[in-house]
Amino acid sequence: MKILIMGLPGSGKTYLAKRMQPILKAAWYNADIVREMANDWDFSPEGRIRQSLRMKNLADFEKSQGRIVICDFVCPTSETKKNFNPDITIWMNTIKSGRYEDTNKMFEEPSEVDYKVIEMNDTNHETIAAKILENV
């Protein structure tokens, strides 16, 4: 199962992923770490597409091994989300603008999500993880 945690920079994607990972016993790929490993800091539309495909390949490998995998990354456009092709989408809709103006301009609100987080709290991760595990 591929879980996408998406949202603007600073919305709490990594915070949520870090807390959900042990509950789900999932593999976890953070976009910043993956970009660092690839030495690819291109945030242009083309760079974003490349990153979505990179995250997809990692997640698809984990899924093919029967594991749950969490990927947290901005995933700013419908094209990047389509490329990644998540089984579950969690949108961190906790802020209206992030710290990078180019990302704010590029970011498209997703049309379909499974979970929409509108505020950060100490229980979101438990609630969402429990619901996911009910359906595994």
Where are these regions (language model features)?
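Conserved beta-strand segments of alpha/beta enzyme cores
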Residues: K25-A27, I88, D114-K116
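Pre-Walker A (Motif I) flank of P-loop NTPase domains
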Residues: M1-I3
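Walker A/P-loop
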Residues: T14
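Conserved substrate/cofactor phosphate-moiety recognition/catalytic segment
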Residues: A17-D60
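Hydrophobic anchor at the beta1->P-loop junction of P-loop NTPases
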Residues: I5-G7
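Small-molecule kinase domains that catalyze NTP-dependent phosphoryl transfer to phosphate-bearing small molecules
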Residues: S78, N83, M92-V136
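ATP-binding Walker
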Residues: S11
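Glycine-rich phosphate-binding loop used to anchor ATP phosphates in small-molecule kinases
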Residues: S44-Y100
